Amino acid sequence: MRSVLTISASLLFGLALSSVAHANDHKILGVIAMPRNETNDLTLKIPVCRIVKRIQLTADHGDIELSGASVYFKTARSASQSLNVPSSIKEGQTTGWININSDNDNKRCVSKITFSGHTVNSSDMARLKVIGDD
């Protein structure tokens, strides 16, 4: 009887751990070095077809000013969407989730994300980390 309870408890614990691990499906899509001068063609290419429903941005090193961002989907018509990003991100700060409306059933793959912006208040280039959630 005791071994049955031990096995049951082990199975329940394993299921609980696997559901927690599955709930946090965030991946670092990449890091972009932000130049000191305003640049509008900073591109993060996604080499593998990846369905991304939303992203977060983190200023890893230095402060960042953003003037825009767009996401491009892997489709025959090269569809894109402008993203509503904050105008500034301080070093160490992470934005809230920014939704990507890929389509009704969220099946289109993201091929690249472009940013316009630059480093502020630093002589070094800031780093913009892009985190995706599928």
From Swiss-Prot:
Keywords, comma-separated and alphabetical: Signal
Protein name from the UniProt record: UPF0412 protein YaaI
Signal peptide coordinates: 1-23
Organism superkingdom: Bacteria
InterPro entries, alphabetized: UPF0412_YaaI
Recorded family membership: Belongs to the UPF0412 family.
Gene coding for it: yaaI
Pfam families attached to this UniProt entry: DUF2541
Nuclease among keywords: no
UniProt-listed HAMAP family: UPF0412 (MF_01372)
Native source species: Salmonella newport (strain SL254)
